[in-house]
Design a protein with these regions (language model features):
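N-terminal beta-strand motif that seeds the catalytic metal site of vicinal oxygen chelate
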Residues: 1-21, 71
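Short amphipathic alpha-helices in soluble, non-transmembrane regions
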Residues: 22-26, 84-89
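Short, conserved charged micro-motifs
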Residues: 16-19, 79-84
Length: 122
């Protein structure tokens, strides 16, 4: 049966790898991991998440941003979540808080191409 989630992939337009690296490593603080050689030619980037998971940025020639389908990134505690929201805001990224889920604090933002991202207390 299923033991966990290995990775989640979000799409990005062709030629956006450097912008992806700036956003996901520079703003969000993720660490890029090398793609296996046979996959590197496809472009994109792989990033390490806490807990052993990965975020894969896949290049899609027919890219359309995803709004409903989105990853939800766990952040350890409300103080760190608030600090991350401030960091995103300082980078010019709009943050929308949502308290509709009882027992959790969360907000939404978008990546540079308009894909929806959720950040929620762990």
């Amino acid at each position: 049966m299923i033991d966990g989630l290995h990775h989640v992939q979000v799409a990005a337009p062709p030629g956006s790898e450097e912008e992806a690296r700036r956003f996901f490593t520079g703003v969000l603080g993720l660490v890029e991991v090398p793609k296996p050689e046979p996959l590197a030619a496809r472009g994109g980037a792989w990033l390490e998440l806490g807990g052993g998971g990965e975020l894969h940025i896949g290049i899609d020639p027919e890219f359309v941003p995803a709004f409903r389908a989105h990853p939800a990134f766990a952040v350890d505690g409300a103080e760190r979540l608030t600090a991350l929201a401030a960091r995103l805001g300082g980078a010019g990224i709009e943050v929308t808080w949502d308290q509709a889920q009882p027992g959790a604090s969360r907000f939404y933002a978008t990546d540079p191409w308009g894909n929806r991202l959720e950040f929620i207390t762990a």
